[in-house]
From Swiss-Prot:
It is found in: Nucleus. Residues 1-19, 113-143, 252-306, 326-337 have a biased composition (Polar residues). This is Sterol uptake control protein 2. Residues 1-52, 95-150, 236-342 are annotated as: Disordered. Changing W478C: Leads to increased ERG11 expression, increased cellular ergosterol, and decreased susceptibility to fluconazole.
Length: 712
């Protein structure tokens, strides 16, 4: 009986199974199978997700129906929909994707292994796709931990996007479009895992234009990487590399090159998804300025100087990143800008610390000092306010002269600029010495302007010999600067009509020829024989102390000096008088200079008459012209008569307050040598036959062996 039951049981079971199977077949034909819940299987079924949902639904972790402008969930619950605060760029990108019928990207969660803490850290690093939902095991930790930006964003980006789970066209586009936007492109050469981008592009079967990367890279290694990218992008075959092998190889490379770092969402990636590579190539690179010097990339010129710092000055750091304490101010003109923005030292220098002191001095010159020069009657307003500053950017010696003069004016109200004045003045003199050896039409106006500015600066800084200020000059320093200016003016004379100073600067003695010719014609009209009678000029005497020297004979060695002095008295209130009166000592002819040096009493009396005119003018104008204050303070009231061994030139130095400091006439030549080391221009200086004048060209008596200068 028992055997019968055991035999029937399988049969009954089989019959029941068959019946059940038949019933299931009928049911399958009529009704769909029931969905298996997650609780029954222990696993969540993967489904398609979209990134285009509103931020409010994302925070609530509910599915968004993506209705715009307000989604259905937010409308139903009366919540503030994230679409209302979405940037316009994201809205346009979403509409563009819908128009192109592009399916939303898929994201898959990675399985988190709980074998060890190291594997947890590794899996966290691999989640590099922006805005990926963190693993449930780490979601709470990420909320509590502060966000630490990676030391190299390019490394973190590449290591994540090269993972096996992120091999899709969207992520490849993310990587490509953001390579040119990342600042630290210099680290491309050190990223070995980027070399696998060729395999990545091939696996994704995405034709990528990486030509814009080649123009952004400087190093040969980085250029080679870009070349490999270009070669791989053109490939059409897929390498036999599985996702698992690719994942393991990139993990090994990432572990050897950089430590694991927490995943940091990069919000800029979403906006860059639909940005074309052509637009990225036109964007300026946001590169970090490198502390390299400008001098190393600019060829050395004759007008350059080694530095831009002022020892002892309260100035900011060097505008091009240098901090040498021994260097002098440097302004290098005509710098060529390289095509590559990353290798452009000018761009990097401009982004580094600027020399605010020099900028302040230039602003002070254009806003204040230039108007004082015009107010003193020295040429036109536009020349000093507009033309001269523009020329200064082309000629460093003029720039240093302007900055020195501006610092002198500013030092009257602010302290701590003495060393700055000295540095700029020294560089201006040094660069002028080089520039006068190569005079041409392009630098003529700059030379004239620089010479005039240095004259005014020396007048402003004239001081007593006991002064200890670094910016102070000897009381007679203006004479040497005038001599240097006369050297320059003589060398560039006559000025062409194209010169800015053609109508305003006049140091010629053209009207002296008219005076002498008038005297000759008057004698001829009276029937006086030239060979048997002495000729006199019609020069007027304006100083009773030298009245006995009038009338002046045509063959008098004092004729030219007295004629120029007479001209000064007549033109005292003309616009350019300030230049004429201070240029007088520099334009003395050689014959009168010889008499003065030998101690000729009449020559010294003429110089004393000039001195009285000079002091009277400076005393009258010192309150109106600020740079006359210095020289007006050092000019004594009375000049006692010198005679004998003191020497005429020493007398000239003494009444200016600088006599005791100069004990040898060779020191004067040494000062002039600063402007003319070779001596080629000195031969032209203070030479009657080479004065910037029409005198010698109009009068035959000044030429040849029969000239009146050679008459005995």
């Amino acid at each position: 009986m028992m055997m019968t039951v055991k035999q029937e049981s399988p049969n009954s079971t089989l019959n029941t199974s068959e019946f059940s199977s038949d019933e299931n077949l009928k049911t399958n034909n009529s009704e769909p199978p029931k969905k298996v819940s997650k609780s029954s299987t222990g696993k969540r079924k993967y489904h398609q997700k979209s990134r285009n949902g509103c931020s409010t639904c994302k925070k609530r972790r509910v599915k968004c129906d993506e209705q715009r402008p307000v989604c259905g969930n937010c409308t139903k619950l009366k919540l503030d929909c994230g679409y209302l605060h979405e940037p316009l760029e994201n809205i346009l990108n979403t509409k563009k994707d819908i128009a192109n019928n592009e399916p939303p990207s898929k994201k898959r969660k990675r399985k988190v292994s709980t074998v060890s803490a190291a594997s947890d850290s590794e899996s966290t690093t691999q989640q590099a796709t922006p805005s990926l939902t963190p693993s449930p095991n780490h979601s709470q930790d990420i909320k509590t931990q502060p966000v630490i930006p990676p030391t190299n964003p390019l490394s973190a980006l590449s290591s994540g996007l090269l993972s096996a789970g992120n091999l899709n066209n969207l992520n490849v586009a993310h990587l490509v479009n953001n390579l040119s936007g990342l600042g630290d492109l210099s680290n491309l050469a050190s990223l070995g895992n980027l070399a696998s981008l060729s395999n990545l592009a091939s696996l994704a079967q995405l034709p990528i234009d990486l030509s814009n990367l080649g123009s952004l890279l400087d190093s040969p290694a980085a250029s080679n990487i870009a070349a490999s990218f270009l070669g791989s992008a053109a490939a059409t075959t897929v390498p036999p590399t599985t996702n698992s092998e690719f994942k393991e190889s990139n993990q090994r490379k990432s572990q050897t090159q950089m430590p694991p770092q927490p995943t940091v969402p990069i919000t800029s990636m979403g906006a860059a998804t639909t940005t074309s590579s052509h637009q990225q190539a036109n964007m300026p690179s946001r590169s970090k300025p490198q502390p390299e010097t400008l001098q190393s990339s600019i060829p050395a010129t004759t007008s350059g100087s080694p530095g831009m710092s002022y020892p002892g000055c309260p100035s900011n750091s060097d505008p091009f990143g240098r901090s040498s304490d021994k260097s002098l101010p440097n302004i290098s003109p005509n710098m060529s800008i390289p095509a590559n923005p990353l290798s452009d030292p000018l761009t990097q220098g401009m982004r580094s610390n600027l020399n605010m002191l020099d900028l302040k001095l230039m602003f002070h010159y254009t806003s204040v000092v230039a108007n004082t020069i015009t107010g003193a009657g020295i040429s036109d307003t536009n020349i000093w306010n507009c033309d001269i500053p523009k020329l200064a950017f082309e000629h460093p010696f003029l720039m240093h002269s302007i900055l020195a003069f501006s610092a002198t004016h500013l030092s009257r109200t602010e302290k701590g600029l003495d060393q700055c004045v000295t540095c700029h003045r020294g560089d201006a003199l040094r660069l002028l010495r080089e520039a006068v050896l190569n005079i041409n039409a392009d630098n003529t106006d700059a030379l004239v302007a620089s010479a005039l500015i240095l004259i005014m600066d020396s007048l402003a800084n004239a001081s007593f010999p006991s002064s200890t200020s670094p910016k102070s000059l000897p009381a007679s320093a203006w004479i040497f600067h005038v001599k240097g200016a006369a050297t320059i003016l003589t060398a560039v004379w006559p000025l062409t009509e194209a010169s800015r100073f053609y109508k305003f600067i006049s140091v010629d003695l053209g009207d002296l020829g008219d005076i002498i010719n008038q005297g000759v014609n008057m004698n001829k009209s009276k029937g006086i024989d030239r060979e048997n009678s002495a000729y006199y000029t019609d020069l007027e005497c304006h100083d009773a102390d030298i009245a006995d020297l009038f009338p002046v004979l045509l063959d008098s060695p004092y004729l030219i000096t007295l004629a120029y002095l007479n001209k000064l008295h007549k033109e005292r209130y003309k616009s350019d008088f300030i230049l004429r009166i201070f240029a007088f000592p520099a334009l003395l002819d050689k014959q009168f200079m010889g008499l003065l040096m030998s101690g000729d009493v009449k020559a010294m009396r003429i110089m004393r008459s000039y001195y009285k005119l000079l002091r009277s003018f400076t005393t009258e104008m010192k309150d109106k012209v600020w740079f006359l204050e210095g020289v007006s303070q050092v000019l004594p009231v009375n000049v006692e008569e010198y005679a004998g061994g003191a020497g005429g030139m020493h007398m000239m130095m003494d009444f200016l307050g600088g006599g005791p400091a100069i004990v040898d006439d060779n020191e004067i030549d040494a000062e002039i040598t600063k402007f003319d080391p070779s001596g080629t221009l000195t031969n032209k200086l203070i030479d009657t036959d080479n004065l910037p004048s029409v005198l010698t060209s109009n009068l035959d008596l000044m030429q040849g062996d029969n000239g009146f200068m050679n008459m005995k």
